[in-house]
Amino acid sequence: MLQTVFLTMLTLALVKSQVTEETITYTQCTDGYEWDPVRQQCKDIDECDIVPDACKGGMKCVNHYGGYLCLPKTAQIIVNNEQPQQETPAAEASSGAATGTIAARSMATSGVIPGGGFIASATAVAGPEVQTGRNNFVIRRNPADPQRIPSNPSHRIQCAAGYEQSEHNVCQDIDECTSGTHNCRLDQVCINLRGSFTCHCLPGYQKRGEQCVDIDECSVPPYCHQGCVNTPGSFYCQCNPGFQLAANNYTCVDINECDASNQCAQQCYNILGSFICQCNQGYELSSDRLNCEDIDECRTSSYLCQYQCVNEPGKFSCMCPQGYQVVRSRTCQDINECETTNECREDEMCWNYHGGFRCYPQNPCQDPYVLTSENRCVCPVSNTMCRDVPQSIVYKYMNIRSDRSVPSDIFQIQATTIYANTINTFRIKSGNENGEFYLRQTSPVSAMLVLVKSLTGPREHIVGLEMLTVSSIGTFRTSSVLRLTIIVGPFSF
């Protein structure tokens, strides 16, 4: 009976022992590792590859098992593959203790390596041992097995800082950016990291301490081709007058003002960065350098036209007085009305002068003179009335310009009949009361009428020139008169 009771109690003890024993499986890893479903083990996370700006202050990031180090860029790294002392897996699983002295990320730490990375406390995760000596670093690369987290729902786990236990009893990252537990400023952007977060500045800003300050892009050329204007968080380029931004918003290209908005009144010439206006012939630029004003050529010079200058838009023209016509655009030429149209009668002859014409009788002879040839009147010897008068009167006509320069030879008188043993003398008989003329004998049979005072037209001046012929032996004496009509034109041309 006692034997039966003992067996029964032994069986119950065994059953009770089996019920209270907890079966633990491992599917999660400690911080710095992740589960590899293929190898069915935890593998190291390369924080230097996934953590932005893992190291500060110009330090370089060196990944190791379960964490990373920030070392000076001049540091010499010596890898020691010796296996570090490790606790048994049972001890590792139960306590989480490790022999390594370095842990990574933002776990509870007792010290910080400058530039980033952490030195773990005694409760840190297992990892490689780092030995330092001035600027030499020895890293044991053989890792201890990472701590695995039991997946039993009834087991309460302790997660590292930045992690929390999920409903599946695994340590999952806390997204501080979405949960609002970050301490980023309003002008910063929160970026979640595995087990932590970082605060980045908005584009166009850079961190200075804990604050974000504007980046002055204009102080670091060459952002812009010509002008640069810095704005909060950005900048923009601007061009000098006469230029505009190209499609790349950086380069400045010339504005062709002559094609776009031609402001010139007449001619436009584009130049680099500007334009100039020019005017057609006969115009000049106004004070605004855009419009054109007519040039009054007639006011600039009094020698453009022989008679009268008439200003016109962009040009000028010359006019001549009545009786003249314009030749070669500027000079005036007399119109010979006697060859074209005149109002003289049939018994009159037309005499043209500078600027007009006159009609004179074809027979100018007065009694007792008779017409013997053109403009020559002779007094017959048989007529008793001809004894004390000149034997002949010749009518001549000439025209001169007004204000002719003096002295000037204007007319020559010459004997048509030459007698032997005679002496010819010449004198001005009439028409020289004001002394405008002088008669100079040039030969025994001729003389020259000289104008010694200027005559201003229009006027008609009649001068009587007499040639007296006397026989050297005193046998006879005779005289002839030349009645010269001088027509002075109204102008000096």
Swiss-Prot record:
Glycosylation sites: 249
Tissue spec: Expressed by olfactory ensheathing cells (at protein level). Detected in lung, intestine and kidney.
Region (Mediates interaction with TIMP3) location: 259-493
Family: Belongs to the fibulin family.
Positions of the EGF-like domain: 26-71, 173-213, 214-253, 254-293, 294-333, 334-378
Function: Binds EGFR, the EGF receptor, inducing EGFR autophosphorylation and the activation of downstream signaling pathways. May play a role in cell adhesion and migration. May function as a negative regulator of chondrocyte differentiation. In the olfactory epithelium, it may regulate glial cell migration, differentiation and the ability of glial cells to support neuronal neurite outgrowth.
Signal peptide positions (record): 1-17
Pfam families in alphabetical order: cEGF, EGF_CA, Fibulin_C
One MF term in the entry's GO annotations: calcium ion binding
Description of how the protein assembles with itself and partners: Interacts with ECM1. Interacts with TIMP3.
Protein name stated in the entry: EGF-containing fibulin-like extracellular matrix protein 1
InterPro entries per UniProt: cEGF, EGF-like_Ca-bd_dom, EGF-like_dom, EGF-type_Asp/Asn_hydroxyl_site, EGF_Ca-bd_CS, Fibulin_C, Growth_fac_rcpt_cys_sf, Nephronectin_domain
Disulfide bonds: 177-190, 184-199, 201-212, 218-228, 224-237, 239-252, 258-268, 264-277, 279-292, 298-309, 305-318, 320-332, 338-350, 344-359, 365-377
Annotated source species: Rattus norvegicus (Rat)
Domain of life the protein comes from: Eukaryota
Chief site of localization: secreted
Single GO cellular component term: extracellular space
